Amino acid sequence: MSTAPLYTVVVPAAGIGQRMQADRPKQYLTIAGKTILEHTLENLYAHPQIEQIIVAINPLDQYFDSLPIASKTWVKRVDGGGERADSVLAGLNSLQNADWVLVHDAARPCLAQDDLSKLLATAEHSEHGAILACRVRDTMKRGNSSHDILHTESRDNLWHALTPQFFPLDALRSALGQAMAQGIEITDEASAIEWVQGKVHLVEGRSSNIKVTQPEDLHLAEFYLQHKATL
């Protein structure tokens, strides 16, 4: 009987979360007695195929080292950069002897374990990367700079990109490096792979896998965390 492969997750956590309008970076805000970052890391490590998490932290960060989770043997800290892509690349460059790697947002604490399992299973039958995503359900409008509607976009084949995103390590590291060297804006790892004409598969996941961005998201994330066994 073969053993399931083990993987490392890179978590970029060097951002300051200005939209949250809080007194600290959003990953250090508390939900249900723990910081968002602690929920995120513990949730990832709870999966039996995750063996290590590399957290990219702002070098001037004053919060991470005081968290109990910072001393866990399965957590490795690296210095992050000014942009998400810089932090992800720092995490990737610290990796050795890995074929595949996951990248997950620090502010997504509500990832479902079976969604993560579905994503990891793609490595068993594909040489390409994949991301968790959920289908667009609302009517989508294209607007102009004056906030006037130009037209309605078709929802067919439109998806919300989520994380984790899962790629061969060398392919992702190369794509990020090339895109950054050309000054391309990288909003997620898939966009770097797309830029080098790589193939990325969509794995449907739950819409409850939200990214905490606005103040009202804190209450929604707390609800999902408290009810994750039934969602």
Swiss-Prot record:
Pathway note: Isoprenoid biosynthesis; isopentenyl diphosphate biosynthesis via DXP pathway; isopentenyl diphosphate from 1-deoxy-D-xylulose 5-phosphate: step 2/6
GO molecular function terms listed in the Swiss-Prot or TrEMBL record: 2-C-methyl-D-erythritol 4-phosphate cytidylyltransferase activity
Keyword Zinc carried by entry: no
Family (UniProt): Belongs to the IspD/TarI cytidylyltransferase family. IspD subfamily.
EC nos: 2.7.7.60
Name recorded for this polypeptide: 2-C-methyl-D-erythritol 4-phosphate cytidylyltransferase
Residues the UniProt record annotates as site (Transition state stabilizer): R19, K26
Catalytic reaction annotation: 2-C-methyl-D-erythritol 4-phosphate + CTP + H(+) = 4-CDP-2-C-methyl-D-erythritol + diphosphate
Any single biological process term in GO: isopentenyl diphosphate biosynthetic process, methylerythritol 4-phosphate pathway
CDD domains, sorted: CDP-ME_synthetase
PANTHER family: 2-C-METHYL-D-ERYTHRITOL 4-PHOSPHATE CYTIDYLYLTRANSFERASE, CHLOROPLASTIC
Disulphide-bonded residues: none
Organism (species): Pseudoalteromonas atlantica (strain T6c / ATCC BAA-1087)
Chain positions of site Positions MEP for the nucleophilic attack: R155, K211
Top-level taxonomy: Bacteria, Pseudomonadati, Pseudomonadota, Gammaproteobacteria, Alteromonadales
